[in-house]
C-alpha cells in the first residue's frame, strides 16, 4: 500500500517577510486562502519559502505557527533538511514535537557527499523521528543527486515514504519508480511535469504554481486521478505560460512578485535574491492577466 502523505497538489508556500522578521498575520491569510482554494497540503520552509535565509528561530516558529493555523485540516509538511546532519535532526525532531505530519529533506548541499553519505544522512534523520519523511532531489541547486540504487536502499526505511523529484529527468524518475516499487510516493517538484510524473505513477506535485492558482494545480491532479487524462493534459498545457513566467527568474523571485501583484503583503525578498527585471515582470503580469488572476 502506498505511503502517501497527501495525494494531489501541495503548495510550496512562500514566507511573507517584514524588514525584521516573518509576517505571521499574512502567512495565516495565505494559508487560509490556500485551504479554501483546494490545496491538498501545506509545505512550509522549503526553497520557495526562502528557508536558506531564515534564522533558526524563524524556521522553527514558521513550522509551529503553520501547524497551529492549519489545525489538522490538511497535512503540513515541514522542510527540515540541512547540509549538517545533526542540525537536520534537531529541526526534524522539533517539527515532530509541534505536530507536523511529515518532513521534507533536501539533499545536503555544497558539501556534495557520496551516495553512501546520502544513505547514512537520511537514515540517521529517519531513525531519529517517528513521523514520515519525503526526500527532496534537486541537484541543480544542491550539487548532488540521488541515484537509482540509493533510492532503492532508502525506500526500505519504514519512515522514508517518498520523494519530491525536481531533477527534471523523467528517465531517471522512471528508473526510481521501478527500483522502489509502488508504495514509494513520487511528487513532481516541477510544475511543468505534473502530468508526466502522474503518468509514471506519481502521487502529485509540490507546487509553486499553487501559490497563485491553487485550484488549477489541484484540478490538474484530480482530473488525472479521475481518469480524465485529456483534461489534465489540457490544463497542463494551458498553464504552461504561467508556469514559465513563474520560473523566468530563479524561484522564488517571480512567485513572490506575483503574490504581491495579487494583493498579498508578501514583503521583501531576502538578499542575495533581488527584484525582477522589468522585462520578466511584464511577462509575469501578462500571464497572470491571461488566467484571470490579475485585473
Regions found by a protein language model. Name each.
Residues 8-16, 37-39, 199-202, 206-295:
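C-terminal alpha-helical cap/extension of soluble enzyme domains
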Residues 137, 159-160, 270-271:
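Glycine-rich phosphate-binding "P-loop"
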Residues 27, 59, 63, 88, ...:
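A general structural signal for well-ordered alpha-helical segments in protein cores
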Residues 127, 141-247:
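Catalytic alpha/beta core domains of metabolic enzymes, predominantly
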Residues 2-11, 15-143:
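Active-site beta->alpha loop and helix N-cap motifs at the rims of alpha/beta catalytic domains
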Residues 37, 61, 65-70, 94, ...:
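Alpha-helical structural signal in soluble globular domains
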Residues 2-5, 175, 184, 259:
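Catalytic cores of TIM-barrel enzymes
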Residues 28-31, 148, 281-288:
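Short, amphipathic alpha-helical "lid/cap" segments that border enzyme active or binding sites
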Amino acid at each position: 500500500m502506498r505511503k502517501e502523505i497527501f495525494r494531489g497538489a501541495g503548495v510550496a508556500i512562500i514566507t511573507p517577510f517584514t524588514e525584521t522578521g516573518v509576517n505571521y498575520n499574512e502567512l495565516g491569510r495565505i494559508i487560509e486562502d490556500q485551504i479554501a482554494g483546494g490545496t491538498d497540503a501545506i509545505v512550509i520552509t522549503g526553497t520557495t519559502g526562502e528557508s536558506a535565509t531564515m534564522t533558526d528561530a524563524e524556521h522553527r516558529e514558521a513550522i509551529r505557527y503553520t501547524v497551529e493555523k492549519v489545525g489538522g485540516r490538511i497535512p503540513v509538511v515541514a522542510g527540515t533538511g540541512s547540509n549538517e546532519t545533526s542540525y537536520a535532526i534537531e529541526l526534524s525532531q522539533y517539527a515532530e514535537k509541534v505536530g507536523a505530519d511529515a518532513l521534507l529533506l533536501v539533499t545536503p548541499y555544497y558539501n556534495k557527499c557520496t551516495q553512501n553519505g546520502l544513505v547514512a544522512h537520511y537514515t540517521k534523520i529517519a531513525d531519529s523521528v517517528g513521523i514520515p519523511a519525503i526526500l527532496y532531489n534537486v541537484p541543480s541547486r544542491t550539487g548532488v543527486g540521488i541515484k537509482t540504487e540509493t533510492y532503492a536502499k532508502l525506500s526500505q526505511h519504514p519512515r522514508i515514504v517518498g520523494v519530491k523529484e525536481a531533477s527534471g529527468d523523467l528517465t531517471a524518475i522512471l528508473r526510481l519508480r521501478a527500483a522502489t516499487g509502488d508504495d514509494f510516493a513520487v511528487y513532481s517538484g516541477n510544475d511543468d511535469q505534473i502530468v508526466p510524473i502522474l503518468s509514471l505513477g506519481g502521487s502529485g506535485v509540490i507546487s509553486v504554481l499553487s501559490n497563485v492558482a491553487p485550484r488549477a494545480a489541484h484540478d490538474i491532479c484530480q482530473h488525472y486521478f479521475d481518469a480524465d487524462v485529456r483534461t489534465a493534459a489540457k490544463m497542463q498545457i494551458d498553464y504552461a505560460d504561467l508556469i514559465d513566467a513563474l520560473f523566468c527568474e530563479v524561484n522564488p523571485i517571480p512567485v513572490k512578485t506575483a503574490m504581491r501583484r495579487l494583493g498579498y503583503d508578501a514583503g521583501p525578498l531576502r538578499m542575495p535574491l533581488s527584484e525582477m527585471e522589468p522585462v520578466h515582470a511584464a511577462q509575469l503580469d501578462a500571464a497572470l492577466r491571461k488566467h484571470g488572476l490579475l485585473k
